[in-house]
């Protein structure tokens, strides 16, 4: 694999905006008459809506009060999402996993950064970064402890194969108010985030003398990416509808052209500075989610009104960015590492006794195919349907997962669904589906989703039984397709699958044992019913 550049099919980056999911925590809003209402956000950057505590659709009226509004069907939502997506040419996109990128801190004309640049530097690229703070929301106190910068996150997720450098510049101040760039159009999409990015780049070039040529790592004439962290709140986690929803997109898809230092700025991602609930700066969760889109990964959460469960807190591309209040996102799953080319799973075919260590420690996973064959190419798999087995433990980046144990994921890859960023919108055709060990799919993120907490076997793959699943000291063991005899017994009684009937030394003297393990150092002839061969101990 090339050190910095791999070829993947990156669909939504080339054709649409990808976004972080709405935060599930409701926001208490005080209305003009002093009454309170709890508002819940749903959807994503393409189309989003709000509900009250009863699940009824609501909207903010011109008089400042929330009122009931007509709920839309899944079909209507999908139609609106499709209309809001500006489509570019569909093609295989050569993704440059850039070793260096630009992060711009951006003030609006009416909202300025509250966080020191030095803190943003440490959070994104610092060595041994730690963060400790507390806050109270709705009478509950949250005590947050986290460690690890965004750079460390991607270093660890890639098993040391990717070490991005994020150069933090700013703050720069754009000319318009937050509401100008962030207000929603009739489809629920932000109006002018592209103009914010373009203007910020131009100002950074002029005021901070940023040399944009150093961010074209593959020298193709285009800056590999720009990440904007904008002042204030974001719409996905409680901010007003006039704030910007964190997302990844292309300026060209919005009809905006930006050129600085002879380089074209196109691919960008953005996220908010402050967390609505703690009123402090956000953790690295949203940054890591959006930057993962830059790398080419799609969203795994449901983007219509369907209520089926997805990967939720188990995955960075679902609700995982909010783990530990947005400070400790889960590491890349085996699938995400496979897709990026940072892990090659082992295809298991024959009966075997399996031992599997924690993914973060080993960077190992297993692949099961119903045909017992696979090309082992993560971003262009053949067959397109397969299973991945990995061991997830509540340590490091996975400390705040709902549980620990063996994770079994079913992949049903579809070019069109990856392209449309609707990977898991259909409950009958999930693209990346967590196989819940307990069989209960009506709850979000629970300990019994994994084996053996939820069950000690899985027989759902015809002729590919996974049985006797155990977990000891963080290590998973199980029998695949019935397993094999105990290794000790097999060595004692067989050689190359056949029973040992006699053993001779090189002088032709028959040994008193047929157990190879009992032999002292030397050269021997091992006899089985059909053959004999020499071994050296």
Positions of PLM-derived features:
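Sec-dependent N-terminal signal peptides
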Residues: 4-14
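A residue-level detector for well-ordered beta-strand positions
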Residues: 28, 286-289, 501-502
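C-terminal outer-membrane/trafficking sorting elements
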Residues: 15, 486-537
